Each structure stands twice: as C-alpha cells, then as structure tokens.
Amino acid sequence: MNKKIIHLIANSHIDPVWLWDKYEGMDEVLNTFKAACDRLDEYPDLKFTMSSICFLKWTAEYAPQVMERIMRHVAAERWEIVGGWWIEPDCNLPTSVSFYKQHEISRQYLDQYFGNLEGGRDRVTGRGGE
C-alpha cells in the first residue's frame, strides 16, 4: 500500500465585529496572532495563514512585540499572508469599486511594511507580472 502524505496549514478566520464589538474583536485577533506565533515557535514545521491585512495594522499598533514575531515568521516563509483583502468582505453587497479599494489599501500596507515578500505579495494581491 502506498503511503499518503497529508499537509496541514494552520489558518485563522476571524470576523471581528460579527460576534463582538470592535475592541473585543481586536482582542480576539491579537490573542489569536500571539497563539499562532507561540505554535510556530513550538513546531518548526508548522505554517500559518491569515488574510485580513487590517489585522496586521492592529497588531503593529497594539501589540508591536507580536508584530515583530510575525515579521520574523513572514521572513522565514512560515507565516503566509493570503487573500489580499483589507478585511474579509461581504461579497454579496459591495460594488466592484469596494473590492478594488480593498486590494489597493492592502497593497499599499503590504508594500510599506513588508516590501516584496519574495513575490508572495504578487501572488496574494493578484499583481503578478507587474
């Protein structure tokens, strides 16, 4: 019988104001990111993904020590920034301008704070080939 290999990548999806007010949601994000960094430090083969770029801004502002850890994990290609949205949108109601703005704001933030991300940003925000 052939052995099968299964790859698991940790992910966090948080709707910061669905169940909580803004500050409770922000607290959930910061606690989740700290826990993710702890798990990455504990398990060297683990990878983590997240998709709401505004969560990185919140972390930089309110938990800079966690943000430093995240930046180290991003540089080590163990923390993957995926999706490219500023925050996960409701895709049923917004206009195309809203979607464009989400990507534009995210690209600006990623460019400013993470640079090229070794091509990862292009993969995340759909800017491949630019």
Where are these regions (language model features)?
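Carbohydrate-active enzymes and regulators
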Residues: 1-130
